[in-house]
Amino acid sequence: MAEQEVKLMKGNEALAHAAIRCGADGYFGYPITPQTEVIETLAELKPWETTGMVVVQAESEVASINMVYGGGGAGKKVMTSSSSPGVSLMQEGISYMAGAEVPGLIVNVQRGGPGLGTIQPSQSDYFQATRGGGNGDYYVIVLAPNSVQEMADFVDLAFTLAFKYRTPAMILSDGVIGQMMEKVVLPPIKPRRTEEEILRECPWATTGRSKGRKPNVITSLELKSEVMELRNLHLQEKYRKIRENEVRYETKFMDDAEYMIVAFGSAARIAEKTIEMARAEGIKVGLFRPITLWPFPTNEIAAAAAKVKGVLVAEINAGQMIDDVRLAVNGKVPVEHYGRLGGIVPEPEEMVKVLKEKLV
């Protein structure tokens, strides 16, 4: 592999290439549409022969996330990927990782639900991802790509944030981004960390007891309530720092906007075409795209909403992110929703129509 390569490939394929190139130590996954190309691409590339990266098709999603738990606990950069019902099966393991402060990467290429649902794209896992889908008071860092390029770029970013804060991180994609093909600039190759680097950078890791230090213990269990409360307070302080320092977002056409569309992922791509069509009719619309769904850009949306007459939240679901947008706007201007369900992707023409009917 060259230092940097320009390719035409699917989002799922780009993510697999990026995992190898960012120095990942292991991938543990299980096939499920529409993300199966991730593990297929890794199997085809055989990184165990080049970088030494381990690739395992586990017996289930439950096994996959617990392999990530174990690898992350040893200070390794490890990851898994799945789609909506598969990620639901991982929630216990993700909660354990959050409680034990184990870094790792989970990728959700969303499909429609509830239940087995459909293999078509959706954004209906927003609540699960941003509220901590398992038990307990915890959050995971959630990045929402809206292009094949970001599918590649966010792998290294997610690992960086996961290890910086000792927490699970998630890339919340969907079947549109996972399956679409675009030009992508694959990142430069980053070698896997040596055992010495892991010992230096992750002094908490269970790497085997070194001479002269106490053994490391990784667990989410505390039997004394007072100690468990202190652990939880420590986690909440960490989440406060993440909220303070790691909010990411993008705005477009907001300088003269009278109305604002808030959308993430593939819905934001559709919103851009909507804005182009609306502006051609003289309706001044801008885009606010949250990149981190958690931490959510609450203050930034509030500031942007203060300059417009109304907000339209566009999602491929029945209305989930709109709750966070309404909390941010705090009743200052009208906030309306437009979404499609069952794996149906919204059309820009429909979005323009809803914008006119509900806000303009």
Regions found by a protein language model. Give the residues of each.
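Conformationally flexible catalytic loops at phosphate/diphosphate-handling active centers
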Residues: R166-T251
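Peripheral docking tails and interdomain loops at the edges
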Residues: E315-V360
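Generic long, charged, amphipathic alpha-helical segments
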Residues: A271-A304
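Glycine-/acidic-rich phosphate or pyrophosphate-binding loops and their flanking alpha/beta elements
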Residues: K10-A14, Q236-Y259, E272
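N-terminal glycine-rich anion-binding loops that anchor highly charged ligand groups
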Residues: K7-E44
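Thiamine diphosphate
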Residues: E37-R131, L143-F163
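Structural signature of the thiamine diphosphate
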Residues: V140-E197, E350-V360
